[in-house]
A protein has these predicted regions:
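An alpha-helical, amphipathic repeat domain used for nucleic-acid recognition
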Residues: 1-103
């Protein structure tokens, strides 16, 4: 049923792919799942803290590929990457700030 499918799809995308809420919601809508069911499952599985932690983990793996680029360009590319993966601009900005402040 749709409930079980939504739950398993969401867990796979969160744990394996490290996708953000926006990307997951978009993919589930394309599969024909109702908005209220998507929102219910997203609220149960993902908080802003979890979302930030996943984005940070994803960014740590990606940031090495930007070596040799200037910092501003690297930050822009990393934030665009995170937003394509479904993270909000606020989370992408915060992750980039934290990643590049570490350096």
């Amino acid at each position: 049923d749709d409930n079980d499918f939504t739950n398993s799809w969401l867990q796979n995308r969160i744990q394996t792919k490290l996708y953000g809420k926006h990307r997951i919601k978009h993919e589930l809508k394309l599969k024909g799942i109702a908005d209220d069911m998507i929102d219910e499952h997203l609220d149960a599985h993902s908080s802003d803290d979890n979302e930030y932690a996943r984005a940070f983990k994803l960014a740590q793996g990606k940031v090495g590929s930007f070596e040799g680029s200037d910092a501003q360009r690297s930050q822009r590319r990393l934030s665009q990457f995170l937003m394509r993966r479904g993270y909000s601009s606020a989370i992408a900005y915060r992750v980039c700030k934290d990643i590049f402040d570490e350096s």
